[in-house]
């Protein structure tokens, strides 16, 4: 058929100098020409002649037998069922489809999720014994090249594709109000080649060279929807503006999103930036943010103590105060602020009686011990007791120590008080629940730093760190998917009144997957079959909502090929039908 260009397989170069290599025919083409099953076909790339070698049946049998392997498969099979068809995997395929990067990244992410080990140097041994989406390119050098190939442009395209795929998957569900939790964490690094590493105080107030990671998590799914890396000496409060700018550049739709932030991001500048950019918010306002916050608490303090304002569902008293907030919608640097734009903010005041009572009990107990020690032997007072005695105790005219109740009451006045500010949430209970659910971003960070052992970068260049961070976020998303399935199962069990199925800890997904990873399968060229699965291990599959595996057929796309990320296109070229005219 002269002129035909239909692809029939791949050409694998065996000798780069002469261009001599072997043609690996596709399954579809071999179905058209079954006789090719009995031949190996070779060709000189520069010539049109084909060389056919008959396959020895005994040699072929031994070759196929050597391809039968026993692998760990339960955990990765379960992960395939969970992520398969998800917006995450579709976005991964859209952006990283070349040279099977999507499946290579997925296989590496599975390693992180199952092992909880961020040291990718151990991946090669794991890949040799585990059923994975992709099994080639597992050496340290190949992994390093893969990570360095991931640029900021890829990350932006991926996050954009993820939002689009999420929109397709959930459709009208996304028209409802969604809550995204924003927070950041510091990751230690002693590399001098990562540009974002700077000396700063981490979350434990320890000064060390570090890089910061900001994360935005969907509070419903627990999955990251946005992340970025920034300099280690940048304070939390100054990161919101850049985050909003990047979301706008990436054209991420947040019209129905409420951004939930903790006290580290509480500032009038951040509130105004979010209002200017159309990002609704719930912000935990520090009492020392400005005098107006303290004045509002004092003005409504009696209402907070009033039992009529107690909300049983959240077990706190709550009072909502609408205030008029004036700001510049289009500020001009260097010009005096006009504050001509007006918007209503809802300041929700909360009073937790239990916290106040517990703080009072601790202060009272500590003071009585300090006074007792003072009476027995003042010289033996500890430094902490001396401070307590100085701040909250007086001496009577006869030298007897007494508690100064006015000072003690002032100390406890704001104990148990929380202030949340929102531009859209008018109900105090709804606002409180939204803020409490920001625990999902804390779970994500615990997953990232503790569960996936990413408390250090473990790479030595900016290029590798960008790729490594993306891989860690991919693993965090998958881990959160598993975690949310366990959580949903437990909630259903509790509603039914049955015994709790699986205790949910921050690392519960790792423990469950570790048990599933001990389930083996036998893999051969035509497919795979699992060992018999019974009892408790069947229950584990049910907990995460996936069917118990049995047997399956190996798909064409799952088989090994010889494409590598650093191999030029002419190393693995399509063979056209017109090359076979002389057959």
Predicted regions and their residues:
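Short, glycine/acidic-rich hinge or "gate" loops at secondary-structure transitions
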Residues: 138-140, 257, 486-500
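Basic, amphipathic alpha-helical segments enriched in Lys/Arg and hydrophobic/aromatic residues
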Residues: 461-482
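Short amphipathic alpha-helical "interface-anchor" segments enriched in bulky aromatics
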Residues: 430-458
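Dynamic "connector" segments at or just before major functional cores
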Residues: 2-193, 215-233, 411, 520-583
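Short, surface-exposed basic-aromatic patches at helix termini and helix-loop junctions that form
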Residues: 252, 271-280
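Electropositive, glycine- and tryptophan-enriched low-complexity nucleic-acid-binding patches
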Residues: 206-249
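Acidic, metal-coordinating catalytic cores used for nucleic-acid/nucleotide bond scission
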Residues: 235, 259-269, 287-290, 463-466
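An anionic, glycine-rich sequence signature occurring as long contiguous blocks
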Residues: 229, 280-434, 509-583
